[in-house]
């Protein structure tokens, strides 16, 4: 039996090995990376199974902690039962004892004298905003005090009429009259007048009192009505005394302290009195008595007259019936001096350094001869035709035509490194006749040497040495100028030259400028007082006025002196663009007789 069992086991092993050999080799399953290069799918599954076990343990611990806390709270409540009962019993006993011994409240003493105690005011009702939907802003003008009393006595058919009672009439101008007929009372009917501010807050005793017994007829319309028309009617009032039949008169005089002046100012009188028109219509204010009385029978009737262009037309005719005037009241003319006007304030843009320190010292008007008018107007016309490609920012304050320049600093030196000549400058065009004054004077012996070292105050940057030498050569042959403050002597000796007999002095060369404009020098027209030196052709360009005088035979102007660059740079009129390098010069300080300045 044992042999058979071992044989069977041997056969099984052989069969199994044959079956394994007959199976094809299995291909490996590709691994899926959850995190590429760090975590594959097998590791991810292992982590998930471990996390599930931790969640189960956490739930068990949370349930255990909850049960322990509930048991501990029950023990705490059991221990606090006795102290809580004792505290509640104590509070109940104290409350019962306080009820047995109540204290009386006496209240506040001297409430009337205490400023902190007072009755609350009634809150104001909410007003509708003017910006609400459907609302229109309305300005409510207060009604006059005296007029409101008469509104109640009038008939409902004429709501716009109001009476001028005796309280509004002058006390001194009243004259008693003996009449058996009902007295006529003047009534003023203003067409639409929102408010009569003249009679506002007036007392019966001190209203419209005319001092010195001087009266004048004055129509007093409302301020808010531009062209009111007043109609005066007569109303039978037998209950009123005869003293009410008189003329409403006001005195238009400037007198402080009067009772009427407190209610009617001079500005109100100005608006009330019609202004004279262009045809000469004037309102004749009569300062004497204006009571035009006419006795018909035994009745005294008053006449209120308002002046018109043809004469005073009576508004109130004799009789008891209402009369209307044949001429309308002259309307109030507009005063041009009181019309609103545009308030123009020029704004100055300061583009020149050190201008705020001495703003009035640079641009100072000097008298100019009448013969320069034509050349100056021509130069201005040419200045307006400047080429559009030249971007120049002109300041907002105008340069005067005959302005005298004074150096704005204590020592104006040329610093080309800081302000090199270039286009696009923010400095304005120079006006014709714009001159520069010399501050420092040099002895005459300096004029012989052409070296740039002659200008110790000029700061020449690197690269400008050649130009400095050329300027020195030009400066060597410069013309002498008279000192400041000396005018030409009017005699036969100096009549031709126009200079004084004193030894002249020259300007100090501290302001040489090398300027490269983009224009053709042949097509350039210089304004009077400006000259240019063309380095390429070695030619000095003079203004057109000087050239014309030279052709006619008049003596030419002396060679011009170099300008200063402390404030502005020379500008010329251009027509075409081209690369050239001329130099700009200006006339000397004193006016040359034939230079047109």
Curated annotation (Swiss-Prot):
Phosphoserine (modified residue): where?
237, 241
Q: Where is this region: Disordered?
A: 1-32, 171-192, 302-335, 549-569
> Sorted alphabetically, which keywords does the UniProt record give?
Phosphoprotein
Record's keyword annotation contains Phosphoprotein = yes
User: Does the record bear GTP-binding in its keywords?
Assistant: no
Q: Where is the composition biased (Low complexity)?
A: 175-186
**Family matches, as Pfam families:** DUF4639
Listed Basic and acidic residues bias regions: 1-23
Q: By its UniProt entry, which InterPro entries does this protein fall under? A: DUF4639
Bias (Polar residues): 557-568
The name of this protein is Uncharacterized protein C2orf81 homolog
Lineage, uppermost ranks? Eukaryota, Metazoa, Chordata, Craniata, Vertebrata
């Amino acid at each position: 039996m044992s042999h058979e069992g071992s044989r069977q086991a041997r056969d099984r092993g052989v069969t199994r090995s044959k079956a394994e050999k007959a199976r094809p080799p299995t291909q490996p399953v590709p691994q899926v990376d959850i995190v590429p290069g760090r975590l594959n799918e097998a590791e991810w599954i292992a982590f998930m199974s471990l996390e599930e076990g931790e969640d189960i343990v956490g739930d068990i611990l949370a349930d255990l902690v909850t049960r322990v806390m509930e048991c501990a709270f029950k023990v705490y409540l059991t221990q606090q039962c006795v102290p809580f009962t004792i505290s509640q019993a104590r509070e109940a006993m104290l409350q019962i004892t306080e009820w047995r011994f109540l204290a009386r409240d006496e209240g506040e003493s001297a409430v009337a004298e205490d400023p902190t105690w007072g009755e609350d005011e009634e809150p104001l009702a909410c007003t509708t905003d003017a910006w609400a939907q459907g609302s229109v802003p309305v300005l409510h003008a207060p009604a006059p005090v005296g007029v409101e009393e008469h509104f109640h006595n009038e008939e409902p058919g004429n709501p716009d009429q109001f009476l001028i009672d005796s309280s509004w009439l002058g006390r001194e101008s009243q004259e008693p009259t003996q009449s058996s007929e009902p007295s006529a009372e003047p009534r003023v009917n203003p067409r639409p007048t929102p408010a009569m501010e003249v009679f506002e807050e007036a007392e019966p005793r001190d209203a419209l009192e005319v001092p010195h017994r001087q009266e004048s007829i004055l129509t007093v319309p409302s301020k808010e009505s531009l062209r009111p028309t007043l109609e005066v009617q007569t109303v039978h009032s037998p209950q009123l005394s005869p003293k009410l039949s008189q003329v409403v008169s006001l005195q238009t005089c400037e007198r402080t302290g009067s009772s009427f002046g407190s209610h009617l100012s001079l500005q109100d009188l100005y608006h009330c009195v019609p202004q004279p028109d262009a045809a000469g219509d004037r309102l004749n204010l009569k300062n004497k008595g204006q009571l035009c009385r006419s006795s018909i029978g035994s009745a005294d009737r008053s006449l209120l007259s308002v002046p018109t262009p043809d004469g005073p037309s009576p508004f109130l005719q004799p009789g008891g019936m209402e009369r209307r005037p044949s001429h309308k009241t002259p309307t109030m003319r507009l005063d041009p001096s009181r019309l609103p006007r545009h308030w123009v304030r020029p704004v100055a843009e300061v583009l020149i350094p050190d201008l705020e320190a001495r703003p009035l010292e640079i641009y100072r008007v000097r008298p100019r001869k009448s013969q320069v008018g034509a050349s100056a107007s021509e130069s201005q016309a040419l200045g307006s035709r400047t080429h559009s490609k030249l971007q120049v920012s002109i300041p907002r304050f105008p340069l005067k035509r005959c302005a005298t320049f004074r150096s704005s600093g204590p020592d104006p030196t040329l610093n080309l490194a800081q302000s090199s000549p270039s286009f696009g400058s923010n400095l304005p065009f120079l006006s014709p006749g714009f001159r520069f004054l010399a501050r420092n004077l040099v002895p005459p012996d300096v004029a012989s040497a052409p070296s740039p070292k002659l200008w110790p105050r000029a700061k020449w940057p690197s690269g400008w040495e050649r130009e400095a030498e050329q300027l020195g050569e030009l400066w060597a042959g410069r013309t002498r100028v008279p000192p400041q403050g000396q005018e030409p002597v009017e005699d036969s000796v100096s009549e031709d030259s126009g200079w004084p007999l004193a030894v002249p002095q020259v300007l100090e060369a501290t302001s040489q400028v090398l300027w490269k404009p983009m224009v053709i020098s042949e097509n350039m027209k210089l304004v009077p007082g400006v000259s240019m030196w063309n380095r390429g052709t070695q030619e000095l360009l003079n203004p057109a006025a000087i050239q014309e005088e030279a052709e006619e035979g008049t003596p030419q102007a002396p060679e011009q002196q170099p300008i200063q660059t402390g404030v502005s740079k020379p500008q010329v009129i251009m027509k075409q663009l081209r690369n050239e390098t001329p130099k700009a010069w200006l006339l000397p300080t004193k006016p040359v007789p034939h230079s047109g300045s």
